[in-house]
Amino acid sequence: MQSTHISGGSSGGGGGGGGEVSRSGLSRIRSAPATWIETLLEEDEEEGLKPNLCLTELLTGNNNSGGVITSRDDSFEFLSSVEQGLYNHHQGGGFHRQNSSPADFLSGSGSGTDGYFSNFGIPANYDYLSTNVDISPTKRSRDMETQFSSQLKEEQMSGGISGMMDMNMDKIFEDSVPCRVRAKRGCATHPRSIAERVRRTRISDRIRRLQELVPNMDKQTNTADMLEEAVEYVKALQSQIQELTEQQKRCKCKPKEEQ
C-alpha cells in the first residue's frame, strides 16, 4: 500500500518501511497505515509540536508552506490535486472539519464559489441529493421483506394443507380393513382349498339325488331340514317293508289244481 503525507519542517524524520523524502517535503511510504501514523508521531516529537496536534492541522500547516505537489506516479498526482482543491478553498488555510455524516459534509462544502471538487469539472451548484430520484434503501428493503414474508406465508399455508390431507389419508388407510378378493370358483391352487371344493361338490351331488328320491324335499331350503326329511322318508319305507314281510308270512295260498 502506498500513501503520502507532507512533513512539518524542511527535514522530516525517517519513515518506516523504506520511506523516501524529496526536497519538496513529500514523503513516500510503502507500508501499512499504522506505520505511517507512527512516522507522523515521531516527526511531531522531533519538531517539538504539541502532543494533541491533529493530523488535519499538520496537513493544513504544510499546505500553506508546501505549494503544489508533483509526483511521477498518476496516483500521487490525483491525491495532490484533491488536496490542493481541498486546502485552497479557505484563504485562512484552516481545514474544514465536520462531525456529521458525509452527506452533510458534502452539502456544506459545496456552498462555496468553486467547491471542493472544482478541479474535477464538477460545478458548485450541482444537486448531489436530487429530490426526483427516490433512493430510500429502507423502503426498498421493507418492500422486499413484506414480499418475502407473504410468499413464505403462502408456501406454509399450501404446505400445511397438503400435510393435513396426507395425515387424513394415512389415518383413513390405518382405520380401514384391507379388502381380500376371493378367488374365482375352480381357480384355487392350495391343496386344502382344492379338497374343500371337492367335498362340497360331492355333498351337493348327493343332496340332489336325495331330492330326486325323497318327495317334498326340494321344498326345504336348509340342508339340515332336507336331511331330516330324507331320514323320515327312509324310516317310513322301512316300516312298510316290515308290514309287507309279516303279511307275506301269514298268507297261505292254495294251488290252482286243488281249486
UniProtKB/Swiss-Prot annotation:
Cellular component, GO, one term: nucleus
Biased composition (Gly residues): 9-20
Superkingdom of origin: Eukaryota
GO biological process: circadian rhythm; cuticle development; regulation of DNA-templated transcription; regulation of gene expression; regulation of photoperiodism, flowering; response to cold; response to heat; temperature compensation of the circadian clock
SMART domains: HLH (SM00353)
Annotated GO MF terms: cis-regulatory region sequence-specific DNA binding; DNA-binding transcription factor activity; protein dimerization activity
Start and end residues of each bHLH domain: 187-237
Keywords: DNA-binding, Nucleus, Transcription, Transcription regulation
Subcellular location(s) per record: Nucleus
Subunit: Homodimer.
Protein name: Transcription factor bHLH80
Species per Swiss-Prot/TrEMBL record: Arabidopsis thaliana
Gene symbol of the encoding locus: BHLH80
